[in-house]
UniProtKB/Swiss-Prot annotation:
Disulfide linkage: none
Protein name: Calmodulin
Entries under Pfam families matching the protein: EF-hand_7
Extra remark beyond the main annotation: This protein has four functional calcium-binding sites.
Binding site for Ca(2+) 4: D130, D132, D134, R136, E141
Positions bound to Ca(2+) 2: D57, D59, N61, T63, E68
Higher taxonomy: Eukaryota, Fungi, Dikarya, Ascomycota, Pezizomycotina
Highest rank taxon of the organism: Eukaryota
Amino acid sequence: MADSLTEEQVSEFKEAFSLFDKDGDGQITTKELGTVMRSLGQNPSESELQDMINEVDADNNGTIDFPEFLTMMARKMKDTDSEEEIREAFKVFDRDNNGFISAAELRHVMTSIGEKLTDDEVDEMIREADQDGDGRIDYNEFVQLMMQK
């Protein structure tokens, strides 16, 4: 996954890694991670810091080395892309920008891409995604729907 990064990204991440790696030993410890997170306005607990390190600590030595850091950053970038894509897709459906997709908006978009649906089919699609039962799809319901795909 880290091999999908450009040279420029790798060099930016090397710089970021150096900021975390306060003592320059090539390893990020929970203490170093905590220092940087706090400087960014976060306040993670010791166990949260350990969880963050464990998530990417491939060799289970309790610290993050640069290759592990790269893998983590590549993963985060991939997640960000898909989040942005989902947000953009939601905007396409939410034509009046009120934060909800109504049956009429869903029908309009589906028709414009050549999907002729009956009212029952549109209602069924809304029902499948509509978790709070208000008859429309909000952003969180849309995200859940997209993540199931």
